[in-house]
């Protein structure tokens, strides 16, 4: 039988408690970390047509687009914001393809309170027809929001092709 000295016995007790202490410190650290900012990208396929635009809108890997050569299409693009009393939207970006030489893609972003009231609005436009994508940016005010809504008008299809909302990106701080 092996006899342990007092110092060996203490070190065994400490080594048994060490993992518990480290885990406890880790949990404390994890619980006191500040909330992280969010950066989420949404595909244009999340946008849904308004009732009058249902027959003009189609979806593919380029997102939502208007196939009508006679009328523009209106869509609503949702956001999934985490519930927070202090959530602030820092930036919203859209990637669009505008193929109409006379009408731009137009999107209006709304910050909405819990009761449904509009807190702020921002509108962005594409800058003319182009075969390559364009980035549209909103500069939202630094106020807290409960949720957001974005409505967009996609111009008619032309011989240049159809206009798309491909992706939209949301950046927030807690």
Language-model regions, residue ranges each:
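N-terminal secretory signal peptides that target proteins for export/translocation
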Residues: 1-13
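Short, surface-exposed beta-strand/strand-loop-strand elements in extracellular ectodomains
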Residues: 102-115
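Bacterial N-terminal signal peptides
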Residues: 19-30
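Exposed low-complexity, polar/acidic, P/S/T/G-rich flexible segments that act as propeptides
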Residues: 107, 153-174
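Short beta-strands within extracellular/lumenal beta-sheet-rich domains
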Residues: 67-86
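Sec/Tat signal peptide C-region and signal peptidase I cleavage site
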Residues: 31-37
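Noncatalytic modules at the cell exterior or secretory-pathway interfaces
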Residues: 140-158
């Amino acid at each position: 039988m092996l006899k342990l000295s007092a110092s060996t016995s203490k070190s065994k007790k400490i080594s048994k408690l060490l993992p518990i202490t480290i885990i406890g410190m880790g949990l404390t650290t994890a619980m006191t970390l500040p909330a992280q900012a969010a950066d989420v990208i949404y595909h244009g396929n999340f946008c849904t047509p308004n009732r009058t635009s249902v027959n003009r809108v189609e979806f593919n890997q380029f997102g939502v687009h208007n196939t009508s050569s006679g009328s523009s299409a209106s869509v609503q693009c949702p956001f999934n914001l985490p519930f927070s009393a202090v959530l602030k939207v820092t930036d919203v970006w859209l990637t669009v393809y505008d193929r109409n030489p006379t009408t731009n893609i137009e999107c209006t972003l709304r910050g909405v309170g819990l009761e449904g009231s509009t807190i702020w609005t921002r509108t962005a436009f594409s800058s003319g027809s182009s075969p390559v994508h364009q980035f549209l940016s909103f500069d939202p005010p630094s106020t807290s929001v409960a949720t957001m809504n974005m409505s967009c008008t996609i111009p008619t299809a032309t011989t240049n092709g159809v206009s798309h909302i491909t992706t939209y990106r949301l950046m927030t701080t807690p």
